[in-house]
Structure formats: structure tokens, C-alpha cells
């Protein structure tokens, strides 16, 4: 794990976690989860991870997601005003702790921005899609540059 300096006395407005692609020699070889506040990161899926849990040729390390991603979600729901989770996808839903952390976060009354794997039929993603208090925006090559502005406007108008 690696990270950047984090001052717990300063309460950040936004927190959460993101998934970052690992590229080696021009090839995608894995994914890491990154805490948006601390910068801590851990490899959660990699072609070189020897694991009985494999998805799309990647070995999974669920403890990486539990230690960084789940902790980032929990800290954000306690300390911040806005939660971001990028992304809830095939790798992350393999962690029961992650699924529970997301469900718990969604029970809180706070603006939450999630990216969802479009094709996944995992119960967590299905439940999120069915929520009355959720607004689903599809990212396309045409709208991807404008979506941050649209999301900012929606959060401002709603909260």
C-alpha cells in the first residue's frame, strides 16, 4: 500500500474510493483500489495474483479491497459530505464486506455518486438501479466530457 499525507484534523468535503487500471508495458494487467482522501492504494486484481478467485483472467485479492476500499467508504460516511465510489463492478462485488459497506452507505442521507458496471446483474447493482432516490446517468463517448458538470448541477440542486 502507498499513500499521501493525510491530516485527520481537516475534514474533507468529498471522500470514497476509486478503481484505477494498472498498465505495464502498454497492457492492462490489473486494478487497484484507491482511497480518495488518504491516497492509500492496494492491488485488488492482477494477472499475476495466484488465487482461487479469478475473473476475466485476473486473480483477486479481496483483502486489498476490504482494507482500502471498505475503510474509505466507512470513513467517508462518518466524516465527509459527499461519497464517491468508482466503480461497483465485477471485482468489487466479490467482497462481502464491500457489498455491506455500500449498502450501509446508501442508508445514510448523503449525496452519493457511484459508477456501476452496466452489464452486471449482481443483486447489489440491481437494488441500486431500482432505488427511487437514485438518478442513473449513462456514460457514453458523446457525453463523458459534460457529465461532471451535470453531476455538479444535480448535487447542488438536490442538496
What are these regions, as identified by a protein language model?
Residues 1-11, 57-60, 87-91, 111-115:
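Short linear motifs at secondary-structure transitions and domain/linker junctions
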Residues 2-56:
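N-terminal phosphate/diphosphate-binding loop that engages ATP/GTP or pyrophosphate donors
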Residues 15, 81-82, 111-113:
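Residue-level preference for the first positions of well-ordered beta-strands
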Residues 39-44, 56-60, 108-111, 137-140:
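Glycine-rich loops and low-complexity Gly/Arg-rich segments
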Residues 50-103:
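Phosphate-binding/switch loop-helix module in NTP-utilizing enzymes
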Amino acid at each position: 500500500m502507498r499513500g499521501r499525507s493525510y491530516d485527520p484534523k481537516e475534514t474533507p468535503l468529498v471522500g470514497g474510493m476509486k478503481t484505477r487500471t494498472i498498465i505495464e508495458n502498454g497492457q492492462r494487467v490489473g486494478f487497484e483500489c484507491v482511497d480518495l482522501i488518504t491516497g492509500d492504494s492496494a492491488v485488488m486484481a492482477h494477472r499475476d495474483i495466484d488465487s482461487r478467485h479469478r475473473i476475466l483472467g485476473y486473480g483477486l485479492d479481496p483483502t486489498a479491497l476490504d482494507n482500502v476500499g471498505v475503510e474509505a467508504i466507512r470513513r467517508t460516511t462518518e466524516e465527509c459530505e459527499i461519497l464517491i465510489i468508482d466503480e461497483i463492478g465485477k471485482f468489487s462485488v466479490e467482497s462481502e464486506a464491500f457489498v455491506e459497506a455500500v449498502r450501509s452507505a446508501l442508508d445514510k442521507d448523503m449525496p452519493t455518486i457511484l459508477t456501476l458496471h452496466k452489464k452486471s446483474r449482481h443483486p447489489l447493482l440491481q437494488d441500486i438501479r431500482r432505488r427511487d432516490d437514485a438518478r442513473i446517468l449513462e456514460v457514453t463517448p458523446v457525453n463523458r466530457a459534460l457529465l461532471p458538470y451535470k453531476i455538479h448541477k444535480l448535487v447542488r440542486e438536490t442538496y
